[in-house]
Amino acid sequence: MKIYKTINPVAVQNTYYLESDTHLIVVDPGSDWNKIHDKIEQIGKPITAILLTHTHYDHIMSLDILRETYHFPPVYVAESEASWLYTPEMNLSGLPRHDDMENVICKPAEQFFQFEKEYKFDGFHFIVVPTPGHSIGGVSFIFPEEECVITGDALFRETIGRTDLPTSNFEDLIYGIKNNLFTLPNHYTVYPGHGQNTTIAHEKNFNPFFKR
């Protein structure tokens, strides 16, 4: 599997593209549709799924145009955040501080994640683990063969996700990272929702929220 990234201008958010021999998965389609479209066309493979680490607006701004353009591949999301796709107050686009932008309202998802299930299809193999705390339905995707994890807004390089938002919980976030991410081998690459890549070992050693 090959992994590509584009960076969206709204919230400097990362969209990921996972390429198998035959298909493509898109993770968290953010604000820059033109860049997302160009990357998909460059890869040139059919999209078999769209995975959402969570449903804050910056991670879903191109979701519906992506679906409409590429024959409606199924969208996977945590059930606890499924309604946020079409509820601006919960995906945060409807908050007063975002009055300068349009509300983000998407169609419902087709699939809910099953935690700890091993997903295997179209050349992909991954496990979904809960990493709530930044938002109640935050998840991470573990790819054992590629020895990496996509963490959304749970774990970043030398920091963690915000916990001052609706449904955020600092203790839940720390617990999820320690029990579902830091249990991975130290050499695993971490692909976060914002910022540069890191590793499990680096975060254990240098993340100020976990340094001993």
Named regions from a protein language model:
Residues 32-35, 41-118, 205-209:
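Active-site HxH/HxHxD metal-binding segment of metal-dependent hydrolases
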Residues 27-28, 48-55, 75-78, 130-133, ...:
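Active-site neighborhood of phospho(di)ester-bond hydrolases with catalytic His/Asp-centered motifs
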Residues 1-42, 140-152:
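Conserved beta-strand hairpin/beta-sheet module of binuclear metal-dependent hydrolase folds
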Residues 6, 18, 117-123:
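Short acidic-hydrophobic surface loop/beta-edge motif
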Residues 91-94, 125-212:
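Metallo-beta-lactamase
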Residues 6-7, 108-110, 130-132:
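Short Gly/Pro-enriched turn/cap motifs at secondary-structure boundaries
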Residues 1, 45, 73-74, 124, ...:
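A structural micro-motif
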Residues 14-16, 111, 116-117, 139, ...:
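Residue-level detector of beta-strand structural context in well-folded domains
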